[in-house]
Amino acid sequence: MIKLTQEEQKYLLDSIRIIPDFPKKGIIFRDITTLLNNKEALNFLLKHLKERYKDYNLDFIAGTESRGFIFASMICAKLNLPFVPIRKPGKLPFETFSCEYDLEYGSDKVELHKDAFKNIQNARVLLVDDLIATGGTAIASYELIQKAGAKCVEACFLMNLKDLNGANKLEKLTSVYSVLEI
């Protein structure tokens, strides 16, 4: 499997702005907009992901709202694959599957159209998001893909916040690849 060298990871990491104490004190926010408007770094990332996934025999790429949409759509364009959105509740106009997950204070849901994978049983799906932290959204998204009769062959994240252990939880269900380990 194709992975980046430490030097290549540093190159990408250096293209992401760090904002301390956002959205609240004690949080270190990773602002991907600086990567998105750096065409050299963005093209480097997309070339890497295209190389990694070109031989996975994927049928679809699913992205989670909202920043997962950005990366998933671009990977779809590079691999000539259809995009499937996994959205917050009430945003999809047709019949949906939904999955609830826990937050630090409360819970939330994600939804997926029931026919998102065109009723192709065991369709091979790559799940994409910008970041995995505690794993709640990612695990719920994985479960939605399964509910729709498809198979999540890997979950791909730009960043994994290692200390929050989400990738380790998700790895019990599917393969996980994080471009950057933070």
Curated annotation (Swiss-Prot):
Q: Name one Pfam family in it.
A: Pribosyltran
* A Gene Ontology BP annotation from the UniProt entry: purine ribonucleoside salvage
Give its E.C. classification number.
Answer: 2.4.2.7
State if Repeat is listed as a keyword.
Answer: no
Q: Which GO terms describe its molecular function?
A: adenine binding; adenine phosphoribosyltransferase activity; AMP binding
Q: Which domain of life is it from?
A: Bacteria
Description of how the protein assembles with itself and partners: Homodimer.
What's the protein here called? Adenine phosphoribosyltransferase
Q: State the organism of origin.
A: Campylobacter jejuni subsp. doylei (strain ATCC BAA-1458 / RM4099 / 269.97)
